[in-house]
Structures are given as C-alpha cells and as structure tokens.
Amino acid sequence: MQLSNRAAAREAASRDVLAADLRCSLFASALQSYKRDSVLRPFPASYARHDCKDFEALLADTGRLPNLKELLQSSRDTDKQAWDLVSWILSSKILTIHSAKKAEFEKIQQLTGAPHTPVPTPDFLFEIEYFDPANSRFYETKGERDLIYAFHGSRLENFHSIIHNGLHCHLNKTSLFGEGTYLTSDLSLALIYSPHGHGWQHSLLGPILSCVAVCEVIDHPDVKCQIKKKDSKEIDRSRARIKHSEGGEIPPKYFVVTNNQLLRVKYLLVYSQKQPKRASSQLSWLSSHWFVIMMSLYLLLLLIVSVTNSSVFHHFWNRVKR
C-alpha cells in the first residue's frame, strides 16, 4: 500500500471518524458472515493468493485492529499494516460517506412521507455522496422524472456489498410480488428486515448494529407500486403488478424496482443495540457470591439458635430481666 494511500486514509478518518468506523463495521460484518464469499465484495486483493481468498489471515488482521481513535493517536511502526487494511476499507472511486446530523432524519421522514406509527430515531445517520461518472449517469437516467424516497431493510452483513455494488433486483430473495428490489415508505416495515447483527468489535458505534438504507428511486414505469394516474384519482394498474407475480398487486407502502439503474442508496440509518446497564459493584458482587452469602446467613442462624438454647444464655438472660 502506498504511503499516500495511508495518508489519505488517516486524513479521511480524522475528518469523520464515525463514517470511517461505519465502513470498518460493515466490512467486519461481511467478513464474519457464513456467506462471506458472496457478501464480502469487493475483497482486498492483497489477501487473495493463487486465486484463493485467505479469509483466515484477513480475520486475524481485522481482529488486531484497534479502534480508530486509538489508531489515529498512535505512531508505532507496527500500525502500518493496520493502516494498510483501513486504507483499503476506506478507499472508493465511486462514493464517499459522511456523518449527518440527526436533524436530517426529519427531512428524510418528510421525503418518504410522514409515518403513521411512531418510529425509532436512528442512533447514527450517514449520507452517501457519489462521484462522477456514477452521479451524472444517475441524473441522466432521471431526466425530468421525480425522485421517490423509500427504505430498504437488509441484514448488516449485506451492506458492505450494497454500498460498493448497489442494490441488484435479481439478487433479491423476496419475490412474492415478482422479481425486483423491495422498498417501503414505512420505516417500521423496513426495520423488520434489518435485524441487529455483529459488526466490528472495536467500533465506536457499538459492536452490534442494525442498518436501514434510504434510497433515491427514479419515478419510472419500471418501479412498480400503488400510484395514481397523472391528474386522476384512479390507480395506475400497469404499475401495480409485475408479470408472473404470485401475490397479485403490489401492496400499499411498497415499491418493487425492476431496473437496477433506477435506484441508489442515499442515506444509512444506523441503530446501535443498547447494552444493558452495568449493575453497581455491590449488586454485582452480591449476585456473584450469592451462594456464599446464603450459607453464611444459614450458619449465622444456626449459631443464634444454638446460643439462645444454651443454659449459659438463659442464665444471663434471667439476670438481665431482674
């Protein structure tokens, strides 16, 4: 890895450590998955030897990565290998990710439609910006059409590939209403498909995360949904059903995108699993030594009973009462 790449990665991590941490977390989640051969794409070429992916070496090196704040503060020569790996994780010629303020979530809710049920506010919010030519190509495809904003839920291990390769309709396993990428205007529905998963052990975001994508979708006939005809209250049936659909028409609040060029991920909503609060040290000690405590109390009770039944105790007690 060239020194300039390390310097660029250090600068990127210094500028937005949480965004850099997110990319490390998504990478680590894909690496730990039993489907890692398919979800860890792209894969670092330096760990591909003789056309074989050395997952064990990559797992070992990833496990040795300190958290990014520690890595930024360190200047040890032994950290060069760590920076080589982080540099690869953060490198992209297509996009960049940066942290967004939580107030941006209100804007997202407006873009997707006000929720009918209370939805949890994400712990972290990130925005993706695309470089040319990918960005200009998307807007060329859009032309004069409107943009639809909708949520896509998926397992954490899939997001490394989703970010770098996009959402591909032919890879989607949910096909009740036809082949395509399924999205929804209801965040609570998307969260069902985004269970918490193990990310990076040293993540500043937390070791267990859930992620939901907010997608920009070009309003095109290849995007199937319950939508009204222009200047009419009647549903456009040509867009409400996909050929060979087993479930009939697309339900309300859902979108099925049948063309990969019509959508891209714009935001990432990240939820960190709350760790149970630590009990006080006293409670912790009591819970750890409950058997010893109970036995001690039992022995103390036996001692009290024994003493109270003794003649010496009765003699002393009678003298006290006089």
From Swiss-Prot:
Q: What is its main location?
A: endoplasmic reticulum
| PROSITE patterns, sorted | PARP_CATALYTIC
Entry annotated with the keyword NAD = yes
InterPro entries reported in the protein's UniProt record: ARTD_PARP, PARP16_N, Poly(ADP-ribose)pol_cat_dom
UniProt keyword list = ADP-ribosylation, Endoplasmic reticulum, Glycosyltransferase, Membrane, NAD, Nucleotidyltransferase, Transferase, Transmembrane, Transmembrane helix, Unfolded protein response
How does this protein sit in the membrane?
Answer: Single-pass type IV membrane protein
What ranges does the Lumenal topological domain annotation cover? 309-322
Q: Which reaction does it catalyse?
A: L-aspartyl-[protein] + NAD(+) = 4-O-(ADP-D-ribosyl)-L-aspartyl-[protein] + nicotinamide; L-lysyl-[protein] + NAD(+) = N(6)-(ADP-D-ribosyl)-L-lysyl-[protein] + nicotinamide + H(+); L-glutamyl-[protein] + NAD(+) = 5-O-(ADP-D-ribosyl)-L-glutamyl-[protein] + nicotinamide
Q: Does the keyword Transmembrane helix apply?
A: yes
One GO MF term attached to the UniProt entry: nucleotidyltransferase activity
Q: Where is the PARP alpha-helical domain?
A: 5-91
Q: Its Enzyme Commission number?
A: 2.4.2.-
Outline the extent of the PARP catalytic domain.
94-279
Q: Where in the cell is it found?
A: Endoplasmic reticulum membrane
- Kindly list the residue ranges recorded as spanning the membrane: 288-308
The positions annotated for binding NAD(+) are: H152, Y182, Y254
Q: Which domain of life is it from?
A: Eukaryota
All ranges on the Cytoplasmic side of the membrane: 1-287
Sorted alphabetically, the Gene Ontology cellular component annotations on this record are: endoplasmic reticulum membrane; endoplasmic reticulum tubular network; nuclear envelope
Family note: Belongs to the ARTD/PARP family.
Domain notes from UniProt: The PARP alpha-helical domain (also named HD region) is regulatory, it packs against the catalytic domain.
Report the PANTHER family cross-referenced here.
POLY ADP-RIBOSE POLYMERASE FAMILY, MEMBER PARP
- Give a short account of what the protein does: Intracellular mono-ADP-ribosyltransferase that plays a role in different processes, such as protein translation and unfolded protein response (UPR), through the mono-ADP-ribosylation of proteins involved in those processes. Acts as an inhibitor of protein translation by catalyzing mono-ADP-ribosylation of ribosomal subunits, such as RPL14 and RPS6, thereby inhibiting polysome assembly and mRNA loading. Mono-ADP-ribosylation of ribosomal subunits is promoted by NMNAT2.
User: Would you tell me the protein name for this molecule?
Assistant: Protein mono-ADP-ribosyltransferase PARP16
Q: Which organism is it from?
A: Mus musculus
Q: What is the lineage of its organism?
A: Eukaryota, Metazoa, Chordata, Craniata, Vertebrata
Q: Which gene encodes it?
A: Parp16
